Regions:
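Extracellular/oxidizing-compartment recognition motifs
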Residues: 1-236, 240-244
């Protein structure tokens, strides 16, 4: 059914000229599976991560835990990782990654990237899929709360095939895909970059390969931190804090 609503017309505005190119959105596929294992739901964590629900007040604002229909950061903490093993399975373009019920796989993007995390997810029964991520591995695992924020995206899926992509840009190299309460298949896992485009026109050559590595690292740092202004960082705080940048 259609619901009528009132619309308003926004007056035309004289916008400031951008003077810089629009970002590039190249799709970077996950390159390999680096770890796999099982999940045990319903386990209380030894050191619970409180998140920000305890800081809700008239100044901080937000939604208290009691009024939330779902509380993903509390739910994901009750998943215990067991029987984890290191693997090294290359991913060809579009090759499927099977996840039986209550299992995980860790995907490697090859380097730290900033942008929108996406994949094609297929399931034949209801399943909750968590895409948790971080820039590094901590004891061969993805520690999604390491940066003091909830670095994961949950999907509560009915049977079907879904093409999902995060609404906000994040920074990551490793992605821990978790299938809880059901099985699923992941295909075409990727990160859609959100970066400054013109830095790729620069070239560098040296007889010392270490210098070339440093140059490429500097280029990656710049394109991710300078989509339009020099930002504090491309992950937690995408803002132009001048004293930091």
């Amino acid at each position: 059914a259609r619901t009528p609503c009132s619309l308003g017309v926004t007056a035309e505005k004289a916008l400031i000229a951008r003077h810089i190119p629009c970002p590039a959105f190249k799709v970077r596929p996950a390159l390999r599976v680096t770890a796999q294992g099982e999940l045990v739901p319903g386990q209380e964590p030894e050191k619970p991560w409180p998140g920000h629900a305890g800081r809700i007040d008239p100044e901080y604002k937000g939604y208290p835990t009691g009024v939330l229909e779902v509380h993903p950061s509390q739910e994901i903490q009750k998943l215990a990782t067991v029987n984890a093993e290191t693997v090294d399975t290359p991913l060809d373009s579009g090759s499927p990654v099977e996840l039986p019920e209550n299992t995980f796989r860790i995907l490697d993007l090859g380097t730290n990237l900033s942008g929108f995390l996406g994949a094609t997810i297929t399931c034949s029964s209801p399943v909750t899929v968590y895409l948790a991520f971080d820039e590094i591995l901590t004891r061969n695992d993805v520690h999604w709360a390491r940066m003091g924020c909830a670095q994961f995206v949950p999907y509560y899926l009915a049977p079907g095939t879904y093409q999902v992509e995060s609404f906000e840009p994040y920074t990551m190299r490793y992605v821990k895909v978790m299938a809880v309460g059901g099985a699923c298949t992941i295909e075409h896992a990727y990160l859609r970059e959100y970066v400054y485009p013109d830095a790729y026109e620069a070239t560098f050559a040296s007889s010392d390969p270490r210098l070339a590595t440093l140059f490429e690292a500097g280029r990656e740092t710049f394109v991710q931190n300078g989509t339009d202004v020099f930002m504090d960082c491309p992950s937690r705080e995408r803002a132009g804090w001048l004293c930091d940048s």
